Amino acid sequence: MKSFFIFLWSFFFFLFIGCDKNDSPTAILANLEGQWVLDRVVCFCYFGEAGTENFDDQQLWFSKDQLYPMGPNNDMPNIAPIGKVYDYSISGEILTINQSGKKYTLEISGDTLSLTFVDNEMIADNEISFYFKKGTADPSCIDFSAVIEDGICTMEYAPVCGCNGLSYSNKCMAQSAGVMSWENGECE
């Protein structure tokens, strides 16, 4: 009888308390895919006069198993050097960039993604958190397989505005970045 009571209690516990279907790895991946635009960075670092930082041109794109940091230069913060596609894995709340082994605590709340570097406690002041807002670009805007790292393009200036909201100096630069469509002229 005692075994039956324990079984019954366990059944109702998991039935009513159990796992939230939105916390499953599949749900996290579905919410993660697409464009994320860097909103703010919290760290012991300097980006100019406080309150004047603008990270709008720093983006992070996710597909099922790859991520792609985008932006005009590597001087601004992002979770990995821009212009390269990285494989990643998620275990629980930890996102790992496979090529570098860097780990970030991942949290999605509504249209906000936060990635906090899992720091080495023996190194002072290496804590950094990135906060991204969900972008509006269609996920098909970027083709990860079309990215040409260190692509060679002419330096002609014939600007185009990519479907991701970033300006490129010419069509070749947009194509090398994996951008699938664009309009002539700079983004506004």
Language-model regions: role of each:
Residues 2-10:
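Sec-dependent signal peptide recognition
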Residues 15-18:
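C-terminal motif of bacterial Sec signal peptides marking the signal peptidase cleavage site
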